[in-house]
Amino acid sequence: MITRRSFMAQAAGFTLAALSGELLWAQLSRFHPTTLTVFKSPSCGCCSKWVDHVKAAGFAVEVHDEEDMDSIKDRLGVPSDLRSCHTAQAEGYLIEGHVPAEDIKRLLAARPKLAGLAVPGMPKSTPGMARPGAPAEPYTVVSFQKDGATQVYARH
């Protein structure tokens, strides 16, 4: 049985490890920001707002306006049931849809064996979609493998 003291020590250790990873990422990205290569429709306003969100979080962004997003998603291997309006690549990972910058940072700090992260569809409370004064709507970020297998990565 875990004692309260043991539980508290483990919780403190996990918290310290998480904060250390965030601090390390922040220090490294200050000198060499991670570049997100973003593919989006030239007419999509919410995609441009998401690009602003990730830039504000410290990412460098290279935007490619594309008319045929389905062919881009097919070529990159984005599972059809996870698709959204834009797709990004960062350090070998795919980022599909309105994934929060903090989740991308956590992914890049941990470097798990995944194909990427996705927010399927266009939930109203995600970065780039949220409207000031609108009620928050919970959404889920999922991780996915190349074979399409998914798992909950974060809930917001």
Range-by-range predicted roles:
Residues R75, D81-H156:
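Thiol/selenol-based redox catalytic cores and closely related redox-interacting motifs
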Residues T35-L36, F59-A60, E91-L94:
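Short active-site oxyanion
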Residues L23-S41:
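C-terminal segment of N-terminal export signals and the immediately downstream linker at the start
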Residues V61-I72, D81-L82, A90:
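Thiol-based oxidoreductase modules, predominantly thioredoxin-like and allied folds used
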Residues S41-K49:
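Conserved redox-active cysteine motifs that mediate thiol-disulfide chemistry
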Residues V51-V63:
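Iron-sulfur (Fe-S) cluster-binding segments and ferredoxin-like electron-carrier domains
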Residues A17-E22:
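Hydrophobic h-region of N-terminal signal peptides that target proteins for export
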